[in-house]
Amino acid sequence: MASRGGGRGRGRGQLTFNVEAVGIGKGDALPPPTLQPSPLFPPLEFRPVPLPSGEEGEYVLALKQELRGAMRQLPYFIRPAVPKRDVERYSDKYQMSGPIDNAIDWNPDWRRLPRELKIRVRKLQKERITILLPKRPPKTTEDKEETIQKLETLEKKEEEVTSEEDEEKEEEEEKEEEEEEEYDEEEHEEETDYIMSYFDNGEDFGGDSDDNMDEAIY
């Protein structure tokens, strides 16, 4: 005969794991479900070793902080971009970003670097200041007469100077002409001396005595 329950689930359900291993005894009610999130950091079972204190550790820490600050000030340090606004403005195009400003502040020894890498900074042109000069009063008739007299005196002085220069030039030209004439006369005398021949070949010597000679001379 089959059992009354027939093995079809009419009996009490059994747990698949041992409840006593979790810390719950027989007959104890299960704890209610927790509706709060779990803690972010569970309690530490093992605490870290305390940091070594002393002059050497403080010196190394100061060097590390100094190196970190120097690296952030270099031009190739990438900084986070500034978040853009929802509404773009016209002036935002002409505002320079942070890394470019930092690169301009960097002043290395350019004698060791090629000229092509040197950064050219545009200098702002200074606004021209217009200076208003006081207006000159209009010239009167007396001032005009004085200026005319000054001009006349200057013209007379110029004429005197030009006349003296002309006289000096004429004297120099006369001297040059006289020197040229003397030189031409000397050349003419030398030429006539060369033209006149003073050479005697002796053909006319003894012309009268040839008639009285009986024998021929070879």
From Swiss-Prot:
Region: Disordered, residue numbers: 133-218
Chloroplast keyword on record: no
Tissue: Widely expressed. Expressed in CD4-positive T cells.
The organism's place on the tree of life at top rank: Eukaryota
Compartments reported by the entry: Nucleus
Gene Ontology CC: one annotated term: nucleus
This protein's record includes keyword Mitochondrion: no
InterPro entries xrefs: RNA_pol_III_Rpc31
Sequence ranges of Basic and acidic residues compositional bias: 139-160
GO biological process: one example: transcription by RNA polymerase III
Sorted UniProt keywords: Disease variant, Dwarfism, Nucleus
Acidic residues composition bias: residue spans: 161-193, 201-218
Disease implication from the record: Short stature, oligodontia, dysmorphic facies, and motor delay: An autosomal recessive disorder with phenotypic variability. The main clinical features include endosteal hyperostosis, short stature, oligodontia, mild facial dysmorphisms, and delayed motor development. Some patients show progeroid features.
Assembly: Component of the RNA polymerase III (Pol III) complex consisting of 17 subunits. Pol III exists as two alternative complexes defined by the mutually exclusive incorporation of subunit POLR3G/RPC7alpha or POLR3GL/RPC7beta. Found in a trimeric complex with POLR3C/RPC3 and POLR3F/RPC6. Directly interacts with POLR3C.
Family: Belongs to the eukaryotic RPC7 RNA polymerase subunit family.
Described function: DNA-dependent RNA polymerase catalyzes the transcription of DNA into RNA using the four ribonucleoside triphosphates as substrates. Specific peripheric component of RNA polymerase III which synthesizes small RNAs, such as 5S rRNA and tRNAs.
Name this polypeptide is given: DNA-directed RNA polymerase III subunit RPC7-like
Organism: Homo sapiens (Human)
Lineage: Eukaryota, Metazoa, Chordata, Craniata, Vertebrata
Gene: POLR3GL
